[in-house]
Amino acid sequence: MLFNSYFFILIFLPLLNCGYFLLLKKERGKAALAFLILMSFWFYAAYAVVYAVFLAVQVLLVYGCSRLYDTAFFAEKKRRRFLQLSADLLLLGSLGVCKYLPEVGEKLAGRQDLFAKILLPAGLSYFTLRQLAFLIDRYQEKENHPPFLPYLAFVIYFPTLIQGPLTLSNEMLPQFGALYRNESGRVKPDIAGGFVLFTFGFAKKMLLADHFALAVNFGFSSAPYLDLLTTLAVLISYAFQLYFDFSGYTDMALGISMMLGIQIPINFSRPFQAENIRDFWKRWHMTLMRFFTRYVYIPLGGSRRGGLRTALNILAVFLVSAIWHGSSLCYLLWGGINGIFVVLSHGMEKRRRNQKKEAAGEAQETVEGARKRAGIAGMVGRIQTFLLFLLTLIFFRAENLTQVGQLFSSLFRITFPGFFLRMVQTLDFPENYLFKQIAVRLLPQSGQNLVYLATFFLLMIVAFCLVLAKKDAYETVSSLPEAKWRSLPFALWVGVLFVYSLCSLTGVSTFLYFKF
């Protein structure tokens, strides 16, 4: 079941809200929690019942391991350590076998059917890391053993199950624990705010990400024939597709959670406004980077053991992140290159701080001059960061190294209009029909192409305006005054946006991070 489907929006979500609110109104928090768990199982089993069985078995095993930590037998340090290593190997082993063995094994064996029957449950990477973090926190005695229902809800809570955000136990168990203890007064549902945020995310996915996907799919399938202009347009389109697809999903998950009175962490914080690549990765897929920072980077020593060790630790984080995304060489190169960029950014930032300290004792710069210089430097930094991100996307999206080479070589091929017109012609939307008819009558030779070009540049303008806005969707909804909610123009605008997005569901498309 997908968020962007008629069944989910018109049947599942209303049924969930009605049952959940009815139980909350009767102050039956534990029953509301059980109902939420059942609905989450239904949501997940809609992909395949065997997925739900796999998840249930993994949950029971991890919960059992957590319970063993409190027994007298595992109070001894070596036994406790053995239990932790065994549980970690169990989780990581299941992830490795299901996600990586088929691809790696097929390449080594040269047969595509050898590992075809291995199960790959949807969202495996997310709920495995979620439970791995919980077990590590239990081992380090940062978490107590929770009741079963709150723990089950923490793992299977459907808005975060398939594509994140990658929640941690310390931010979710207290909320589900309050429901379990029938403290329903602590749950503050916000139906209006949640619906608006869900609509914003829905529109991002349907009206922006899926439209940019048309140009992206054409560009990467035509990699040998592209030129500089078309390649840049394709890469920018892919950057926006990736962002609006994933942040759209996150906004929808945040909106659903807001309706239910459950708080989940944000996953994006205006990443395209980052002034360096290091800051970019602090703003993009924030919960995944938080996981790798807390459970990989810091245990390796973080930045406490000198410059070289810090650089190696950063590279390790990005290589692990690359492996999390997939086992192909393109992903490894993507992770390694991003790691090198972040190491260089870290070194330059450290050097810049030292230069500022040295200049502190010299002549003081005027406030206006300093502000102007910082503004110019910030703008240049944003452009550089965006361009670096675009280059790394070649590795992230390419199917193999041959396609990587084709795309890089196209950056040195200058023709006009080349494949650019063919690319924009993929943006053939039903909404353009009237405009195309008028344009053809006025300009028989070039009318349609002008409409396609106008569509592409309109999408680009809207995308740039959104990513460069001072507030993202969540901040916008959170800061809106109550009077705004009650205004008829605002309600009509949100309603039109929702209906327009719903009408765009001509074909259900999966979210990009579904495959991870």
Feature roles, as predicted:
Residues 1-467, 471-515:
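Membrane-embedded transmembrane alpha-helical bundles that form the catalytic cores
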